[in-house]
Regions:
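Intrinsically disordered, low-complexity, mixed-charge
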Residues: 1-89
Length: 89
């Protein structure tokens, strides 16, 4: 079953290759969506795919790449948009 989650990751998450690492991991997991920096210093992402694969990406969001310090992750269940690929915006 395809699921989608919109996440906002707070903490030291910009300037630590969070977006590029998310892109690589999402593509490896077969998860579609996007990731972008927000003006407030957070990182926002959309993960869409098989429930187990999206769960892998949610776990990544909770830890981030080395150098990141994740303080909080806000997760919202959203309707899948039939996205293809994974982009850094």
């Amino acid at each position: 079953m395809t699921v989608a989650r919109r996440v906002v990751v707070h903490g030291r998450v910009q300037g630590v290759f969070f977006r590029e690492t998310a892109r690589r991991r999402a593509r490896r997991a077969g998860v579609a969506g996007w990731v972008r920096n927000n003006d407030d210093g957070s990182v926002e992402a959309w993960f869409e795919g098989d429930a187990d694969d999206v769960e892998v990406m949610l776990h990544f969001a909770e830890t981030g790449p080395s150098g990141a310090y994740v303080e909080r992750v806000d997760v919202e269940k959203v309707e899948p948009q039939d996205l293809r690929g994974f982009d850094v915006l």
